[in-house]
Amino acid sequence: MEGDYSEKYVDYINLSRLSWKRPEGPKRVWRVVDGRKKMPSGEVPRFIIQEVPESMEEELVDFMTKYFTAEETITVSQKLLSDPIAMKEIRTLWKETLRQGVSLVAIRENFESDKKSEIVGVNVLFVCTNEDEDKLTSAIEVRTRKMKTVMGTQFRLAAEVDMAKMYGVDRYLGAFGLSVNPSYRGQGVADALLQARTDIGQAYQIPATETIFTGTASQIVAARNGFEVLVERKYTEILDDEGNVAFPGVEPKFMKVMGKKLLKVNVRV
């Protein structure tokens, strides 16, 4: 087991120090939603949006590796897939984030009980409190140049947003990636995953959410689901540690930090 782990992960990224802990209890199903169009088989699919079972964690990390890393704006720009150590780092980031237990998986509802559940979408989520703000950057101790650029630029942009002042909250829901299987795009899966954050907020008293959306499509979906732009930066103005444009040649014009209130009553800080 240790050998297999070392082939896929690193041992220097650890998010166990984050202060928020999910209340004990079984994994929760947040929503069951119908797709928007027929599949080639002629049926309109139905999706279950739920918390990630431990038995599915490895498959979920593999899903993000396959789809997110290969398509996401800044990981593609940095050619993350070409760096085996950087890939171990981002896989470890996802694996560690799953510890908190609030990440979401979209599963296609299957009426044939003998078939394995099919993952169609994932949103890797975490809860960050005011006291965790500094812990987060130190806990995500990436060492490869590519991941330092990917994470460092996002941390610097996110640091321009003070969630305590912006929304009057002492904790919020953050994210480290959302991805949908290409075969199910256009079915509303990304919308359902973002909408489920409201369910999480209400159930666990998390009053707001903040996420960096790097691509045009995800920014549109976020805006459609009530997210507002808190800060944005042109990609041509985002520099790496050496002062060079961090993500040259990307198609989107802006990287955006977007947020949304999840509860009507704010938590006092």
Language-model features: locations:
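Conserved N-terminal entry element of GNAT/NAT acetyltransferase domains
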Residues: 2-58, 66, 267-268
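Conserved acyl-donor/pantetheine-binding loop and adjacent beta-alpha core of acyl/acetyltransferases
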Residues: 39, 75-78, 90, 95, ...
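Helix-loop element at the rim of GNAT/NAT acetyltransferase active sites that forms part
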Residues: 51, 62-80, 131
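Conserved acyl-CoA
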Residues: 161-169, 192-208, 223
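Conserved acetyl-CoA-binding loop-helix of GNAT-fold acetyltransferases
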Residues: 174-201, 224
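C-terminal helix/juxtamembrane-tail motif
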Residues: 194, 198, 244-269
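Conserved active-site alpha-helix within GNAT-family acetyltransferase domains
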Residues: 203-205, 215-239
